[in-house]
A protein has these predicted regions:
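ABC ATPase NBD Q-loop/coupling interface
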Residues: 63-81
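Helix-to-loop junction immediately C-terminal to a conserved catalytic motif
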Residues: 54
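ABC-type ATPase nucleotide-binding domains, specifically the catalytic core motifs of the NBD
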Residues: 104-119, 128
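Conserved structural motif at the start of ABC-family nucleotide-binding domains
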Residues: 8, 23-25, 82
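Conserved ABC ATPase signature
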Residues: 138-142, 146-148
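Conserved signature/switch motifs of ABC ATPase nucleotide-binding domains
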Residues: 84, 137-140, 157-158, 190
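Catalytic Walker B motif of ABC-type/P-loop ATPase nucleotide-binding domains
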Residues: 163-166
Length: 227
């Protein structure tokens, strides 16, 4: 684990939508094995910041350094490599293909794995998420909680070092919420870097570093859990 050099470094990142500056001079270093949660009001810039970290959205000012690569968002080829092999994204709306089966959705992700036994990787991910019996089910046949577990399994079968999670427990019942949180904690203990944006105060208890976005500014909160 490299604790000397950040995996991701944001330097004076700013972003506008029209005349409204939603992010202003954001500075954040993210290290391997971090578990970070970012809180804030709806529409306050949390998801925008997550998208910038994941190279899904451009910023107007500042500098983004990902795995020692300067400003990868300016180079689409570098951004694509990061998204395929370094960064996994757990979207709020799951981002699954509704008319495909669970297996077909996972096949889209596992193709980037260097393992020669991709079937075993899929089987283990589904068992870890407790949905191995849903392999042949279409996504639209599943509950919201089951879909989020499929989305997590999809990320687990692809190569990644950082997982970004946008409101991962927002629409889940208590059982599925516990499964998702426990899985994120387990992945973090295995060395994965986890970055969550959420309204869920449960993350206060498990994150190593907690932040809040207020009026476009990122502020670190005092409560946190040691690694």
């Amino acid at each position: 684990m490299n604790i000397d050099k950040p995996q991701i470094s944001l330097k004076n990142i700013s972003k506008k939508y029209g005349k409204h500056k939603i992010l202003e001079n954001i500075n954040l270093d993210i290290y391997e094995g971090d578990f970070i949660c970012i809180f804030g009001k709806s529409g306050g810039g949390k998801t925008t910041l997550l998208n910038i970290i994941g190279t899904l959205e451009e910023y107007d000012e500042g500098e983004l350094i990902c795995f020692s690569e300067h400003n990868p968002i300016r180079n689409e080829k570098e951004s694509e490599v990061l998204r395929r092999y370094k960064i996994a994204y757990l979207f709020q709306n799951f981002a699954l293909v509704d008319n495909m089966t669970v297996q077909e959705n996972l096949n889209l992700a596992v193709k980037y794995s260097r393992s020669t036994d991709k079937k075993s990787i899929i089987k283990k991910a589904l068992m870890d998420m407790g949905i191995e019996d849903k392999l042949k089910s279409k996504i639209f046949e599943l509950s919201g909680g089951e879909q989020q577990r499929v989305a997590l399994a999809r990320n687990m079968v692809k190569p990644y070092e950082i997982m970004l999670a946008d409101e991962p427990t927002g629409s889940l019942d208590s059982e599925n919420k516990k499964i998702v949180i426990d899985t994120l904690v387990k992945l973090n203990k295995l060395g994965k870097t986890i970055i969550v944006v959420s309204h869920d105060k449960e993350f206060e208890k498990i994150a190593h570093k907690n932040y809040i976005i207020e009026n476009g500014k990122l502020k670190q909160l005092e409560f946190a859990v040691e690694k």
